Amino acid sequence: MLILSGRVYCGAFPKFLYHQYNLQLVDLSHIQIKEGFPSWLLHNNTKLEFLYLINNSLSGPLQLPLYFHTNLSNLDISDNCFQGYIAPMIGTYLPRVRYVNMSGNGFRGSIPSSFGNMSLLQTLDLSNNKLSGSIPEYLTIGCISLVELILSNNSLQGQIFSRTFNLRFLGELQLDGNQFTGSIPHSLFNCTFLRVLDLSHNDISGKIPWWLGDMSYLEILDLSMNNISGNLPSNFCHTNIQKLYLSRNGLQGSLKDAFYGCFELIVLDLSHNNVTGSIPPWIGKFSQLSYLILGHNNIEAKIPIQLCNLTQLSLIDLSHNHLSGPILPCLRSTSNSYRQQDGSYNASAPVSMDEPLEFTTKSISYSYQGSMLSYFSGIDLSCNHLTGRIPTEIGNLNEIHVLNLSHNSLTGEIPASFSNLHQIESLDLSYNNLKGSIPSQLTELNFLAVFNVSYNNLSGKIPDVKQFATFDESSYRGNLFLYGCPLMKNCTEISLPPSKSRTSIENKESSCFIDKDAFHASFGVTYIMVLLVIAAVLYINPYWRQVWFYYIEVSTNNCYYFIIDNLAFLSKFRFCNFCK
């Protein structure tokens, strides 16, 4: 057994390994080996069962041993710089392997059909390479023990599986980020233990099969970014499905009967489709729902009051629909990073999200996933027909990061309670009928990076301190009675008596700006004066002159030894990241 993972910096394979013949486990991960894969490592150690070379800088092809290696069980060479073709006979020379991870390399060409000889294989991960062609039929027949098949982010094409299919124990199938065509194969119905099915970012067409809703173990279904069409399936959920991603397809029809019964849902993403009708009242029974993404559809009617029953919501996106009526004062949005199972909060236990979700932040659509999504919360109700006042209760969402209510018909004033949105980064209230002034309390929002109230009926002076000093004219345009920086007008233009002179107006208009030339000149004079005072003190007082030179000498020595001590570390750091 040899385990050097992350403990030393080798740069090359340790030479003593060439003389080892009885090793059963070798773990040389994360030590930045930078050379080709040595065939003698497998050839010499015929008893080797576990080989881990994760996250190094290995390059060239993966060389097989000269003879069959019947003891190797786990092979992980992920996150390296391997290139070329995967050896066509890999399944013949390594017939008893149970775990193969070759992801994150530069392998190209087709997937060898000899993988089908690995009858004990349980996990095959070839994701994030440059593989092309189709999935070999022999792989789907011979790998009878396969539990995880991960081929994401390659250039694979053709039908997903042929009719001949024998992966009965398959639990996780990830084929996202390829060029697969055709419909979802009915043969997947035989995978009764399937928990994760990710076919996103392909060219799959047809309808959503009814039998997907009958797969009792299915937890994650991702069919987003395809060409799937037809109506939403009725009575779809008879399972414990938790995450459902169907965005950016051509789905249509009503939500009325589509997902009733999916009471374990955490994620429901139907954005960028042609969904019609209203949001059904039974949405309030989805007590675990954290992410409700229904933007860019044709949903109409009012926002149902039952939505307020969803206490776990982190992201709500109902934008670009035809919703009407008032904004519910009871809407909630809470970051998952603080929530525990009992409803209390714990910052150390975020909910991990592996699949990305699109959400518009700071006027740009971003994809959030993983821990970042777990710490993120927001509400987007923009581009609808919402009316009435903005509820003051919205100001109680002190964990929300994004609030977008733009392009509606909202009236009334901006609630002063928005000053309680301590985590807010983007606040968009543009294109409404809001009136009154911008509450001065909003200057306490220290994380506010985007603020937009353009094209309303606001009046009064624009706050010009803290974050508000960073917003440009586009944040306020279209409000006739707003004045102050950064708008090129002053309140005196509206209410100034006739006796006031034009010179007075111009002086007040220019009060927002600083003469750069005067600033630079005054700064230079001040700087020179400070230097002259210091020089005069040192010349007159011998004691201070001695202290000053002593301080200079000590500082110079400290800087010198700091650079010498850290130079080796910096050189090593640059070398470690050379291949990345």
Where in this protein do the model-derived segments appear?
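Terminal membrane/secretory targeting segments in land-plant proteins
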Residues: 492-580
